[in-house]
Amino acid sequence: MELQESTNRLVELIRHSQSPYHTMKEAISQLEKAGFERISLAESAALEPGKAYYVSIYDRSLAAFRVPQSGFKGFCIITSHIDNPCFMIKPNPERKKSDCITLNVERYGGPILNTWLDRPLTIAGRVCVATDDPFNPKTMLYNSKKPVAVIPNLAIHMNREVNKGVELKVQTDLEPIVSLIGAKENTQGWLLGKIAAELGIEADSILDYELFLCNGEEPSITGFDDEFLSAPRLDNLTSCQSCLNAIMDTEALSDICNLVVLFDNEECGSSSKQGAGSVILSSILEKIYLNTPDTDKSRTAFIDVMLHSLTASLDVAHAMHPNHPEKNDPTNPIPMEGGVVIKMNYNQRYATDTNAVSIVEGICRAEKIAHTKFVNHGDAVGGGTLGSILSTSIPAMTVDLGVPILAMHSSRELMARSSQLAMDQFAEAFFK
C-alpha cells in the first residue's frame, strides 16, 4: 500500500463515522465489498475452509475472520475500538436559556473539554422505533449531516481569567445551543420531532435513542509538505482502518485463523456486553473453532489452540509534544513519524511482554517498517487500553501497539501520515 491510498482509506472512514454506529455501518460496507459473508452469532452452521465471514455483536461491535484452509493451530487476532470521547444527549434534553434552546448532555469517556467549544457540531447515533412486537423494536441510524449545534465560549470580557485556565463544568458550561426559541411555545420533545421528521416517522414512535454530539469538521492534510493529518476521531479510527485493511487485503492461511475485532465502549472502561471486558471474544473464538470442519471438538483441544494464539491490540499512542518534551520519558521519545509504537508498561497497564515485543520487532525489521517503543515518564501514570483487559479473558500472548498522535482525546487530533502507513503495513504483515 502507498501513502496516498493509506490516507484516503482513513479519511473516508472518518467522514462516514460520525458515531460508533456509523463506524459499524461503514466497516460492514467495506467487508461486504471485499466478499465477507455475514453470519449470526446465534448460528452454529459449519464454516467453509478458506472463506471470509463477519459477525455483528449487538450492532455495537464487530468481528471479521478468515477460516483456515486446512487444520487449525491457532488464532492471529488484531483488535481495536470504535468509540471516542465526546458527549451524549440525555433523555428529555431540551432546555430554555435566554432566547435559545440548549441540550442537556453527558460526558462520554475523557474528552479535553475546551476543544469542543466554538466548533460546528453534528448529532448522530441511533433511535429505536416501536413495532407490533415489543420485544423487537426497529433500529434506525440518524445523522444530522450538517452542523446543528455549537457550544460557545464565554467572551473574555466576562471571563478575564480564561487564558490562565478555567475549569469547565459539563452541566453549566457545555450545553450546546441548537436553536432559537422564537415562536416555539413548547420545546419539550422538540429534538425528537426534528429527528422523526428527517427519518420519516412519527415522533411518538421513538422509544429511546443513543445520540452523540460529534465534531462535524472535515479531516485536513496539513504541513508544508503534506506530512500531517488533522482530524476528529483519530483515536481510534486509525486502528480500525488498519484492522480492516489487514483482514481484507490478505488471504486465508493454511492452519491459522486471522481475525479482527472492533470493540465498543473502550473509552468508558470496556465493561459492557459488547466491550473487551466481556466474555464475547472468548465465545466467538470458541464458536469459530467448533464450527470449523475437521477440528477436535474437545475443550482441551480448543485451549491448546488458544495457547498457540497471538493478539495485537491497536490503539493510538502519545507522540512527543514539541512544546512539552518534558512530559515524555527522557530516553524513549516518540517522534511523530515513529510508525508502529510498541506500548510497554511493567505494571501491566499495557499487556506487552518481552516475547510479544520480540515478535513485533522481528516483523518490523523483516518488513523494514518504522517502529519504536513507548514507556511513560517515570512520574506519570498513563492510560490503559484493550490489551490488558483481553489478557484476563483469553490465554493468548498479547501486545499493545498504536500510531503516535498529538492532542489525544481532543475533539481534533494530529498525526503523521507516514505512521498510519507503517501501521497498515505491519497489520498486513502480521496476518501473513
Spans of model-derived segments:
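N-terminal hydrophobic/helix-forming segments and targeting peptides
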Residues: M1-K432
